[in-house]
Regions:
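Bacterial Sec-dependent signal peptides at the C-terminal "C-region" and cleavage site
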Residues: 3-18
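N-terminal, active-site-proximal structural segment of metallo-dependent hydrolase catalytic domains
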Residues: 15-47, 53, 59-64
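Beta-strand-turn-beta hairpins that frame and shape the catalytic cleft
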Residues: 15-22, 146-155, 176
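Conserved beta-strand and immediately adjacent loop positions that scaffold enzyme active sites
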Residues: 21, 100, 114, 123, ...
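Cys-nucleophile CN-hydrolase/nitrilase-fold catalytic domain and related Cys-dependent amidase chemistry
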Residues: 43-120, 185-197, 201-204
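Short hydrophobic-aromatic micro-motifs
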Residues: 54-55, 152-158, 178-179, 207
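Active-site catalytic loop in hydrolytic enzyme cores
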Residues: 79, 106-172, 186-193, 247, ...
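CN hydrolase (nitrilase-like) catalytic-core segments centered on the catalytic cysteine
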Residues: 81-97, 163-245
Length: 253
């Protein structure tokens, strides 16, 4: 497989410290309700304190199953892409932090699950999910996103990417890998195990941020958001099923 990396080095900041404060937002999502989710995440962001990086779950403005409650809502959610991106930029500027989460992006007749990383200067970088769980639901992206921020090289991934060790192989020397997800509780043991494996095999901190609660079809999400150290052991974790914000300081090896 030929892997294209988008490695960006222009966001190192003015001070290259050896620690990074990461806010994990494990949230109950309002499925299909963009306005409700944007309002709720705006309130959550205000409670993050002095974080350097703020991480939301996958598809934070809508939830992941676009057919829940009847009808496919991908086009409806994709039409709000500009509003969602502007909110991420606003929060990043106001909090002086990198704020990241994924949403639906449309290009022609193709839909992508796009992670947006918004920076304090108002600029954004993007990663389109490569390993898609359901064929046809989203088109796969072709490249990876790895960027420097405050002395840390950070790689970004989305949910099902976690199962593919080669896709996140640390060939670029990243310090932190971020996985945003809507990962159901029925496979929570896999989520916990794979986060630890990716950290240990790549000798990098791994951040996993999942949604929590129950969706309209009764599918339960345990959350299990947390940060794993380079030794494969948990540094800190959110409580099961809880709408919770946890700010954790990690140190560069």
């Amino acid at each position: 497989m030929c892997v294209l990396f988008f490695v960006v080095s222009g966001y190192a900041g003015t001070e290259r410290g050896q620690s990074l404060r990461v806010a994990l937002i494990q949230a109950h999502l309002q499925w299909g309700d963009v306005d409700g989710n944007l309002k709720a995440f705006g309130e959550r962001v205000e409670r993050c304190g002095e974080a350097d990086v703020i991480v939301f779950p996958e598809l934070f403005a809508s939830g992941c199953e676009m057919k829940k409650g009847g009808g496919d809502k991908k086009a409806e959610i994709a039409a709000r892409y500009g509003d969602i991106r502007e909110k991420l930029k606003e929060w990043a500027v106001n909090k002086k932090a990198v704020v990241m989460g994924s949403t639906i992006f449309a290009e022609g007749d193709r839909y992508y699950n796009r992670l947006i990383a918004a920076f304090p200067d108002g600029k954004c970088l993007y990663y389109d999910k490569h390993n898609c769980f359901k064929k046809g639901a989203f088109s796969p992206g072709e490249g990876q996103l790895i960027f420097d921020y405050k002395g840390f090289k950070i790689a970004t991934y989305i949910c099902y990417d976690l199962r593919f060790a080669e896709w996140s192989r640390n060939t670029t020397g990243y310090d932190v890998a971020v996985y945003v997800a809507n990962w159901p509780a029925s496979r929570r043991e896999d989520w916990q195990k794979l986060l630890r494996e990716r950290a240990k095999e790549n000798k990098a901190h791994v951040i996993g941020v999942n949604c929590a609660g129950t969706d309209p079809d009764g599918l339960y999400y345990a959350g299990d958001s947390g940060i794993v150290g380079t030794d494969g052991e948990w540094i800190d974790r959110c409580d099961e099923g809880k709408d919770e914000i946890k700010v954790v300081r990690i140190y560069k090896n």
